[in-house]
Amino acid sequence: MQAPPPEHCPGVESEQAGQVSACAGCPNQSICSDPNKKREDPGKALVAAALKDVKHKLLILSGKGGVGKSTVTTLLTRYLARSYPDSNFGVLDIDICGPSQPRLMGALGENVHQSGSGWSPVGIDDNVCLMSIGFLLGSVDDAIIWRGPKKNGMIRQFLSEVDWGNLDLLLLDTPPGTSDEHLSVVSYLKDDSAPDSVHAIIVTTPQEVALLDVRKEINFCKKQQIPIVGVIENMSGFRCGHCGHSSEIFPAKTGGAAAMCAEMEVPLLGSLPLDPAIAKACDAGEDITSVKNPTTEALEGICSKIMSSFN
């Protein structure tokens, strides 16, 4: 019989299970530290049951914060939903301490309702729904000061207690880096009997300081055996709306994402320009993917490659 886990338990599937200071004195320490005695987290079965009608799961990752990962998640979702009106898309915002999808999707102030089948995600369009901890806060200015285990518990709730229904694709907007949240969501989503049950896209900017961390993110995916759909280079250049001249705001001193992808043997899905109109629309929660511009032209090719990777 196992005792309840301590407050800061790293989790039974963590590589640190039974080894960190929080494990000292826990009656389960010997079980967790022995790989032959570890049990699978019971939450994994709950997640599998809740997501049985979700065809594909796509992690949107970034090694470095500030590269526009959440904005790219929104743009991809909006463009995919417009391009594939007969498909259903969901977005799960698991950036627990910095949830931005409610603003980007124009859903600030919306409420999450509970039914017999679980939490109902917020409807954004006819074929797009969204779930974020931002909907559960009293104010957009409320700070979330949680340790890893509590964040992991929230992620498990989002995956197992939200009524996602039938989705063709669930996009997960993750925090930057490779933290507890990433390990938690991967452990819940990975299905050993279906190795391609979850995929990843990695967002970067051209400069080397961002690419350094993207290499770590790629290695994280390879270690966790998460297939990488490809890399998106965001803010790759700025084209003046008046004269049409293109400028490199973030110069690619080492060849940018293209050179890094060739080096790491991962696909480059495409590049998105630095566009003030996109920033303005995202701040207002507006969808401008129907307007033809350099960003939507790039999104067309990127989204086509994404959908092709699932076929």
Swiss-Prot record:
It comes from Drosophila persimilis (Fruit fly). InterPro entries: Mrp/NBP35_ATP-bd, NUBP1/Nbp35, P-loop_NTPase, YlxH/NBP35. Transmembrane segments: none annotated. Signal peptide: none annotated. This is Cytosolic Fe-S cluster assembly factor Nubp1 homolog. GO terms for molecular function: 4 iron, 4 sulfur cluster binding; ATP binding; ATP-dependent FeS chaperone activity; iron-sulfur cluster binding; metal ion binding. Disulfide bonds: none annotated. Binds 4 [4Fe-4S] clusters per heterotetramer. Contains two stable clusters in the N-termini of Nubp1 and two labile, bridging clusters between subunits of the Nubp1-Nubp2 heterotetramer. Belongs to the Mrp/NBP35 ATP-binding proteins family. NUBP1/NBP35 subfamily.
